[in-house]
């Protein structure tokens, strides 16, 4: 390169620098004096090339990012709808697989029947697909575009658009609507249960002074005391009971217990039943209606059915016996010594009291028959005698005092004093549940769960042998009974005979629960569990019927027989044989009038 060429290049560079950076003239002349070394020139060239490369890459990535904006992002409504569809389909179990199969088959069939599907722009495939996942996909199509399903018959030939157009097909079948409705109904049940259990959480968090209730876009703030009121709790419990029965009725009527039976029904029958329903109610064909017409028709359908009272709430609540008891609870006329709401898995205290009132009356009806009274007395004798035999004791003395108790209850002269004795202990209703199940059995189990520290120290002492521990436990039980005898106001009353029975039974049960893990412990635990299971069963709508006193008494009798047979079977043939040989005389019946006392 000649000197002239170098000078020209330097001149042009200086001129460019002056024009770009608007340098002063003085700077321009000073630049002419600057000379760059070869290393500086190389660094300048590398920097310039790098800057150009960075600018080019930034522009390239910016274009790619602009193209990706057209794709569905994870947080956009379309993607969320598909994710919700997958979750709903996975929860359906076997119906999920059938829904996917229907989607796959429909994808292949739409190519062959492209012209046919376009006959109904807004619902041409109304009965072609089933499953909750497809019905959720139809919601997207209704909200976005009604003509995207079959807007152009030639679009079905494009492989890239098949999946998208398939999801947008409005698949509004009766089965899908039923499944979606049941999902929303179950969600409502969960919300109501949370509202009912809010009262228990209120005690744990007393700092909360208000609660927000969401209703659409409006949010109302009300105090906890106004919402969690007694009247509100009663109404919510009654609503939940009606909702449970309504759910069971729908499942029994429409085959809700087997989701596959709904999802796999033939499309022809579904179409026919839907058209017949529309024709009977005088509504236009749903196949040729848009979303607005469908909404209006659904409103008319609901109004007509409500007017006809075909699906009224009362028709799904065949429990007038329970409803009457609930009204008495709201008026404060039902009393219970102990509220066992959580133990018996009731919805609330009102639910427990209402069921308790029904159970009391049912037991009155059961004990009105002599056969039932004899059965209960004989069953109690066998079970307790077998427990004593398992503890290697002679049940003869126990059976004698047991017979004395039965003879005492048969004498009408002692009924008034017995009622006073029990009322002083909080038992105001002379009933099989209140006296036997609650006061005697459940209180005994609770006392054995929390024994005195003196008994615990003896039982947990490793240096003492089992026989000494058993004797110490028996002595502790007898000392407690002796103290209770001293507090009795009537020396020969109900509690005198009851404590006489406890002298033989309490040491056996105490050693059975607190002693070593042997056959006696297993039998005592089984006896306790059967009592608890029986109580839970009679307080469960799924196990007994609260429609009337007769049906409830019938179910209680069946449960009594079932639990007693299980206990007798578990006792073993040897224990029963020994107990039978020691039995003196025939069994005595429980007095009728005492156990048939009216519930106040």
Swiss-Prot record:
Q: Name one GO biological process term.
A: mitochondrial fusion
For this chain, one GO molecular function annotation is: protein homodimerization activity
Q: Phenotype when inactivated?
A: Mitochondrial fragmentation: mitochondria become round and show loss of cristae. Female mice show decreased quality of oocytes. Mice lacking both Miga1 and Miga2 show strongly reduced quality of oocytes and are subfertile.
Cite the InterPro entries for this sequence.
Miga
What are the record keywords, sorted? Membrane, Mitochondrion, Mitochondrion outer membrane, Phosphoprotein, Transmembrane, Transmembrane helix
Q: Which Pfam families match?
A: Miga (PF10265)
PANTHER family with a match to the protein in the record: MITOGUARDIN, MITOGUARDIN 1
Q: Write down what this protein is called.
A: Mitoguardin 1
Q: Which organism is it from?
A: Mus musculus
């Amino acid at each position: 390169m000649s000197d002239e060429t170098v000078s020209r290049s330097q001149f042009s560079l200086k001129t460019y620098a002056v024009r770009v950076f608007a340098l002063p003239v003085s700077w321009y002349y000073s630049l002419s004096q600057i000379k760059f070394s070869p290393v500086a020139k190389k660094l300048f060239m590398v920097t310039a090339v790098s800057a150009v490369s960075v600018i080019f890459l930034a522009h390239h990535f910016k274009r790619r990012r602009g193209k990706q904006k057209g794709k569905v992002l994870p947080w956009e409504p379309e993607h969320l709808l598909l994710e919700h569809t997958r979750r709903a389909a996975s929860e359906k179990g076997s119906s999920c697989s059938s829904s996917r199969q229907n989607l796959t088959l429909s994808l292949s069939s739409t190519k062959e029947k492209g012209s046919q599907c376009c006959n109904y722009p807004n619902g041409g495939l109304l009965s072609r697909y089933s499953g909750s996942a497809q019905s959720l996909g139809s919601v997207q199509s209704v909200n976005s575009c009604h003509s995207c399903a079959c807007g152009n018959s030639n679009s079905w030939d494009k492989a890239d658009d098949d999946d998208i157009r398939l999801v947008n097909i409005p698949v509004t079948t009766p089965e899908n609507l039923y499944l979606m409705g049941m999902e929303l109904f179950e969600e409502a049940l969960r919300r109501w249960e949370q509202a009912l259990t809010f009262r228990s959480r209120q005690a744990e968090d007393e700092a909360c002074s208000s609660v927000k209730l969401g209703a659409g876009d409006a949010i109302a703030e009300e105090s906890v005391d106004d919402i969690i009121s007694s009247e509100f709790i009663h109404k919510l419990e009654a609503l939940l009971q009606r909702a449970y029965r309504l759910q069971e009725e729908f499942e029994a009527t429409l085959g809700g217990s087997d989701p596959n039976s709904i999802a796999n029904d033939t499309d022809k029958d579904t179409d026919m039943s839907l058209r017949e329903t529309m024709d009977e109610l005088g509504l236009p064909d749903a196949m040729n209606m848009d979303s607005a017409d469908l909404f209006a028709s659904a409103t008319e359908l609901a109004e007509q059915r409500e007017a006809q009272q075909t699906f009224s709430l009362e028709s799904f609540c065949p429990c007038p016996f329970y409803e009457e008891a609930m009204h008495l609870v709201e008026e404060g006329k039902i009393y219970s010594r102990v509220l066992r709401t959580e133990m018996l898995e009731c919805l609330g205290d009102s639910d427990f009291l209402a069921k308790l009132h029904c159970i009391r009356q049912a037991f009155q009806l059961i004990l009105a028959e002599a056969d039932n009274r004899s059965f209960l007395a004989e069953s109690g004798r066998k079970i307790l005698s077998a427990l004593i035999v398992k503890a290697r004791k002679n049940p003869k003395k126990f059976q004698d005092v047991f017979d004395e108790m039965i003879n005492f209850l048969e004498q009408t002269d002692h009924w008034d004093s017995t009622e006073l004795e029990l009322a002083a202990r909080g038992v105001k209703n002379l009933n099989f549940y209140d006296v036997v199940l609650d006061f005697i059995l459940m209180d005994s189990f609770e006392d054995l769960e929390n024994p005195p520290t003196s008994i615990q120290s003896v039982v947990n002492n490793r240096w003492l042998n089992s026989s000494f521990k058993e004797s110490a436990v028996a002595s502790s039980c007898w000392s407690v009974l002796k103290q209770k005898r001293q507090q009795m106001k009537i020396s020969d009353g109900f509690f005198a005979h009851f404590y006489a029975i406890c002298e033989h039974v309490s040491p056996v049960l105490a050693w059975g629960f607190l002693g070593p893990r042997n056959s006696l412990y297993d039998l005592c635990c089984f006896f306790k569990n059967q009592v608890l299971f029986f109580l839970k069963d009679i307080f469960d709508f799924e196990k007994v019927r609260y429609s009337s006193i007769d049906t409830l008494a019938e179910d209680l009798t069946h449960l009594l027989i079932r639990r007693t047979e299980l206990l007798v079977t578990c006792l073993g043939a040897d224990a029963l044989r020994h107990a039978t040989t020691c039995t003196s005389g025939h069994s005595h019946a429980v007095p009728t009038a005492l156990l048939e006392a009216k519930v106040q």
